[in-house]
């Protein structure tokens, strides 16, 4: 639609809009009211009368211009409605034609669907145009295509993104398509079969069905009835598919729906395209409910029950969701412009200055890790140097040389590291230090498992140096030493050994070799490849991978520590007991760790839990709701260990707590990823009942007071234990990111934020009424009383400071949204102040703008507007498609919260860690907003 405005300071202003549709001409003229005019105004429109109508022949005789007959319609355009003022022929006579009466009646109806588009005079005229075209289509005239230019209209920009090939599927262009055509058609004499069309144009295998429908639509328009095409025909197909114009895109989509090519879309055809789109996006729920959604579209676009809709009706539906995307796109562009200068990478010309800045940024972001590592490395260096100098002054140095110094120096570091490697896994101690002291501000407790792994590497290096120095240097020198040189060694080794075997078969040799073998087994099975089951072996060796293998192999260290003490007591060269220091290094850590294990066993036995509810969700997720032991206190973001004797009496596995501290129960959501979790799901599935007819398709079982209850397996819990996410209350603004089942700690935080906000409201109401804090508020937020009294623990982490939370949940499957549907709805309903901004991303759905998700986007907007429920997630939270643009996420938060300190908490696959952390560093360095990145570690 083309708009023209003529402004002159001394003349009355008029506004005219003209739209040319084939041979039909519609012109609008009237006073210019402008987009801000609230009074409305009258608009006149002249429309060509189809020759097939009565008025086109009777009234047109005296009103023809350029061989066309016109009818003049005067409209009263107001803020939210369009009313017909009069309908006359061009000659001025009133019209009584039945069709025009129907036209007038239709124009007087308010458009519910298009209400969001009616923003100014121009958009109101466009609405009228749509209604006129829809009613004119009752004359069953052919729909002309490609005859009008919308390149400057808002609709063109909104629908420019209706791409039929995603960025990843078809961005290579015609050259790549032509190359694939030549490869595919080499054995078929230059003809491309329908089944290979999707592959040829770059679509993946999962879109094969969609590609077939696209082929049929393109072939129908060209009257191609064969199941194969040549290169010239493929070029025509590609030109239409790759065409960015509004009309080509819309017409292609219409052709895909209108399979019988009669120019109308029936409910059956709508149902088919919904099923096709749902299948392409792996949305099984929508596919099952295609009848319901097809009926919803027909109800909205066919209010007169004609049994079909035209392309204009489809266009109106298409305009809804993409228009929102245009707004979001504009916002994104504004964000980019506002931060472009700050985020623009500028190369520092001086390499020394560049290096200094990088180094200072590194220290600023990692100073906690740096000082701990420097202290640890410094202690190892001191111990190694001390032992080296000590043995250099002994008689053994004259025989074995520097080798004995290297071996003993490495041994001293091994003793240190075998002692401190236990400290990072003393979870109760670490949790107590996090909660009760201020050490968390200086000690990176979040990196406890990473430090544990680093120490393990240092032990491996120490063992290698110690063993190789003895086996390849010290022992051969003792065997080959002369009698005179060996004489000082008789006191330590006895008579000079005659063979290498003498050293190996001794207590020192046997214990050393066994320790190395056991350590190698434990280290190997603890690597990500074995622990996560990425390595597969044939039976019966398949049990050597997975978490069970890791868990049991790690307990070999009970034997290792026993042998280490024996090994340290049977030293050849050191005879005085008080100089054998192995037991001195190990005593305190071993006692501490043993105490932790005893505490875990004792605590789990006295704090029994009762299973209240079990549910098995899509995506192989088991939800366990348990009774809350008396006095059991925890923070959102923390985790606990779970043991089920029916699966394994000895294994304990960590899981994030998904309930909030204010809830009267405990809950965990466990995804089947390994052997133990698979067996656990099997055990609990056996006691669950299949869903009754018409109910949710979930396996579930509930504990009901006084009734026959299922025989639930016995479950023990141990915890809670500290985790990075528990510190979210220290930040006024938090960004919570969960990938798949990694949303579990974030869900607890979301619930806790809602409970805290609710408690604060209740507290304010109670204070206004002169009462103390209500019991409900205390239960919802146990820490609120401390905040009110300005008292907190030494850690200062109990006060609730969070004022804004952004929650991003990214999952691959639609069924995953069922895991926390109730919690998401509760949060959306209770968050009256808009504290929590929730975003669900379903990566199985093609990105916005891809035709395979175009109809899903339309359905989503229509259904959400009518019922407030998202069709993808089944919650009040509207879902997004494909993956988030994390850079834009950080941008928006940086703009919304300048000078703020934002806590970023992530739980999920390691692949995303690097990107999120790098964005946090970049935006912290280049904007006034500081992002603190935290990752969950188990």
Curated annotation (Swiss-Prot):
Region (EF-hand-like 1) location: 185-195
Residue intervals on the Cytoplasmic side: 1-369, 424-454, 531-545, 600-732
Expressed in which tissues: Expressed in leaves.
The FAD-binding FR-type domain, residue ranges: 599-727
Transmembrane domains' residue ranges: 370-390, 403-423, 455-475, 510-530, 546-566, 581-599, 733-753
Coiled coil: 115-141
Record-annotated EF-hand domain positions: 245-280, 289-324
GO molecular function: calcium ion binding; NAD(P)H oxidase H2O2-forming activity; peroxidase activity
Location in or out of the cell: Membrane
Region (EF-hand-like 2): 222-233
Catalytic activity, EC: 1.11.1.-, 1.6.3.-
Post-translational modification: Phosphorylated by CPK.
Domain Ferric oxidoreductase stretches: 408-565
Keywords: Calcium, Coiled coil, FAD, Flavoprotein, Membrane, Metal-binding, NADP, Oxidoreductase, Peroxidase, Phosphoprotein, Repeat, Transmembrane, Transmembrane helix
Keyword Oxidoreductase in record: yes
Domain of life according to the entry: Eukaryota
Protein topology in the membrane: Multi-pass membrane protein
Extracellular topological segments: 391-402, 476-509, 567-580, 754-938
Feature: compositional bias, Polar residues: 767-784
Pfam families named in the record: FAD_binding_8, Ferric_reduct, NAD_binding_6, NADPH_Ox
Binding, Ca(2+): 258, 260, 262, 264, 269
Similarity-based family: Belongs to the RBOH (TC 5.B.1.3) family.
PANTHER family: NADPH OXIDASE, RESPIRATORY BURST OXIDASE HOMOLOG PROTEIN C
Assembly mode: Monomer and homodimer.
Function: Calcium-dependent NADPH oxidase that generates superoxide. May be responsible for the oxidative burst in response to pathogen attack in the leaves.
Record's protein name: Respiratory burst oxidase homolog protein C
Species annotation: Solanum tuberosum
Taxonomic lineage: Eukaryota, Viridiplantae, Streptophyta, Embryophyta, Tracheophyta
